């Protein structure tokens, strides 16, 4: 079987088919792969990732402890597996960057996995792309998202947050969804503005053209990010765009910078949360008793930067016309 890397060129061409030929050629030529994890080995690459160990609930009243156990994080069959289980577990209340030793302890009723490139790798502008299969069930909340490496403009959300994929309660009852499979929409969002409760966000929900469940098979998510511009794609189709006219930061450190806070290096992370406000307050409410074990599978994650426009990253981005 060909390796994922060997198939990369063909896959780029397939994705580009949704755009005009001229744009596809420029995009394929100028995007340079700068970082990737194909998850082809038998264990997590610790030179690329740090598992988070915390039980704080992510600030969203989530119900899991994130652990560094193979029960919750494993690499097998060419995929990263982030696996949630129902089990009582006690661990550090907060991630190490939020708390001094000795870390306070907290007990939760679920365990799961979360990995980050924090302190290892971060990027300013580029294309972030991954192939993933989210789990379904009331109470599941898988995500691939980005946070500022250094919080130059201040604490959350003054320095921004980029949520590329959030899959909340997939398959649960949904009266406003199209189709007959229940909740089939995935969320993308950006967070910015001032400290809570004055924080702001823009978000969108997107379903597959077939209205099928995203949890039924793997799909490819793409973020193209340049100075003052973000474009989001699912399986090559653009579904959302934000520009610097849509965001701001209340930080005095921005000094009237019109593209702040999304003009700094961000790191990437992936996790599978259980419960939390966004999940438990919607669809069938709460956490289903049979939702675990649940697994969030990621086939690969690849990050590119624009070789023809290293400063702003805009020249490689696809055109304004929405893909058909």
Name every feature range the model reports, one short phrase each.
Residues 6-17:
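Bacterial N-terminal signal peptides
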């Amino acid at each position: 079987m060909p390796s994922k890397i060997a198939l990369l060129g063909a896959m780029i061409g397939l994705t580009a088919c949704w755009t005009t030929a001229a744009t596809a050629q420029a995009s394929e030529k100028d995007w340079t792969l700068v970082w990737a994890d194909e998850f082809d080995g038998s264990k997590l690459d610790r030179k690329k990732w740090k598992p988070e160990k915390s039980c704080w609930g992510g600030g969203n009243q989530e119900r899991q402890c994130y652990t560094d156990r193979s029960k919750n994080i494993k690499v097998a069959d060419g995929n990263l597996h982030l696996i949630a289980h129902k089990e009582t577990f006690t661990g550090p209340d907060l991630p190490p960057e939020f708390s001094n030793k000795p870390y306070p302890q907290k007990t939760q009723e679920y365990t799961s996995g979360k990995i980050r490139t924090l302190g290892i790798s971060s990027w300013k502008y580029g294309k972030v792309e991954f192939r993933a299969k989210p789990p379904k069930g009331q109470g599941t909340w898988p995500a691939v998202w980005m946070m500022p490496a250094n919080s130059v403009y201040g604490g959350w959300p003054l320095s921004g947050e980029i949520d590329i994929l959030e899959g909340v309660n997939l398959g649960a009852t949904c009266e406003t969804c199209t189709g007959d499979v229940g909740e089939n929409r995935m969320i993308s969002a950006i967070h910015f503005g001032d400290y809570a409760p004055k924080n702001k966000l823009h978000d969108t929900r997107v379903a597959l053209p077939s209205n099928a469940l995203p949890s039924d098979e793997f799909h490819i998510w793409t973020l193209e990010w340049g100075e003052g511009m973000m474009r989001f794609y699912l399986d090559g189709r653009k579904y959302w765009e934000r520009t610097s006219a849509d965001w701001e930061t209340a930080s005095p450190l921005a000094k009237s910078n019109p593209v702040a806070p999304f003009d700094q290096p961000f790191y990437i992370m992936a996790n599978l949360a259980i419960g939390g406000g966004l999940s438990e307050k919607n669809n069938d409410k709460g956490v289903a008793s049979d939702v675990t074990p649940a697994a969030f599978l990621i086939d690969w994650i690849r990050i590119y930067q624009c070789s023809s426009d290293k400063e702003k990253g805009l020249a490689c981005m696809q055109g304004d016309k929405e893909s058909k």
